């Protein structure tokens, strides 16, 4: 590590400490942090590399020895300072005084998290090591990829491990450190294949070749070509290391001595000495490379990280606002809290039914729906009018065909005409025809009332759901009240509608109104040159309704009927929606406000109403914790930017 100059050492640690601090805050639950993840097939030499970097023994053996993600935080101390270790997992923290205890502590942690046996878990174990002999570096060690399940392992253990690895290396913030033995075909290794699938251009993948002493004779040049990036290209390139083998571990060769032996191995090797001279070999050179890569990666990721934290803070605050602060613990304050909640709800209900914006910010527009319903009601009246006109004209045409006898054109047999075509001779029969047609609209009007009542109920339910999130009893009480008021107001509105139709049985309009409507229709008919809707009704081959005395009389009476129905229809097109809006919106909202506030008089019931859903309580606590850690993360990033803003690792 002597190659790291003083300036570099001063800047590296803050960068790595920043990310370690963010990870310890739990920020990784909310967004991805820059990291180096170590992956490899089983028996790739992954554990040996990590041991060489950290200076401590890690779990070894056959099968899966890394059963949980292991965050290995290494901090370089000054010469002469004591070794320090600490292990943390799922709320547990323990200091480690002796490096020899590290392996045992990791196994204990894995057994507690993943259970005894060979199962794996996604829960992270954090191991912090501070020593003069380690680099400033943080790595995340992941389980080795198993191809075949052994005794005690689930059949899909390989898939479980791959999913876990995928979870880490898919993130753009993660550098994949792929460990591959020199004595296997690099193209067939599952670890490198996984890295290539998520990083096809090799932008964030670094290859580590291990076990160079086991290379078959004659294949050394292939290994050199791989390290020179000439076989499978990775933009971060390759390193090659020789760690302690099983024989050296059995002989208890120290890590310090192993590093010296490694240096001699590469320096003296016929083929590999060039790799050593180029700085591509040995664990110390690997440590330098990894530290530099991590620092570059952190600095590159910081702007995006700051943006993500700001975005998450806003999203979290917005979501937290939905849940509010929860009921106060002090009994004296709980009534005030309840009154505020109920008042806010009833004000939103009144705003909804009067077409104003809701104070809660929820976007509901009931009038856009009602406008469609009432437009459909008007169209129904108009269609009924068209049918009415057509039926009248049809009856007149039928009379002309069947009942005109010996009379010359211009004469009417009044006895026959009065019997067969009532309504054209006396005013009473005229009234009867109008009443009968209008009566047919009564049930459709009541049906429209029920349809609108259901719409209003559903929209008020939405307001209640938004206003009383987390208070199921209060929400239930509000919904029951909305439903009861709907039924009550629907009965009143229906009575008013039926009264309206009873009044419509009185054929009446102002003389001036009727005269204007009749005059307008006459002018329209004169302009069109046809009767009714502009359709000339054929009576026979020699006469029509419009070209003899009978036709003239009938035509005049048709105009009267159509004119009056148009007036009555317009009156109903306005009056029915007014009744519905008044009762189902305005009166319902006012009564809802009154009854909700009256409900608060019952103090015993208030306790029940303020019972909060435990899920909402937990959600609020979760959001508050997230907000707290993200706020701390933002503060850490701000301090970091202010302290070393002018540092540029590219100059190192």
Curated annotation (Swiss-Prot):
Q: Which Pfam families match?
A: Dynamin_M, Dynamin_N, GED
Q: Which residues bind GTP?
A: 40-47, 141-145, 210-213
Induction is noted as:
By interferons.
Region G3 motif: what ranges? 141-144
Query: Where is the protein found, in the record's own terms?
Result: Cytoplasm
Locate the region G5 motif: 242-245
Q: Where is the GED domain?
A: 554-645
Q: What highest taxon heads this organism's lineage?
A: Eukaryota
Dynamin-type G domain sequence ranges: 30-303
CC terms in the record's Gene Ontology section: cytoplasm; microtubule; nucleus; plasma membrane; presynapse
Which GO biological process entries does UniProt record here? defense response to virus; receptor internalization; synaptic vesicle budding from presynaptic endocytic zone membrane
Q: For the region G4 motif, what residue ranges are annotated?
A: 210-213
| The entry's keywords | Cytoplasm, GTP-binding, Nucleotide-binding
Q: Where is this region: G1 motif?
A: 40-47
Has UniProt tagged this entry with the keyword Lipid biosynthesis? Answer: no
Q: Where is this region: G2 motif?
A: 65-67
Whether Cytoplasm counts among this entry's keywords is yes
GO terms (molecular function) for this protein are: GTP binding; GTPase activity; microtubule binding
Q: Which CDD domains match?
A: DLP_1
According to its UniProt record, which protein family does this protein belong to?
Answer: Belongs to the TRAFAC class dynamin-like GTPase superfamily. Dynamin/Fzo/YdjA family.
**What protein am I looking at?**
Interferon-induced GTP-binding protein Mx
- The gene designation is mx
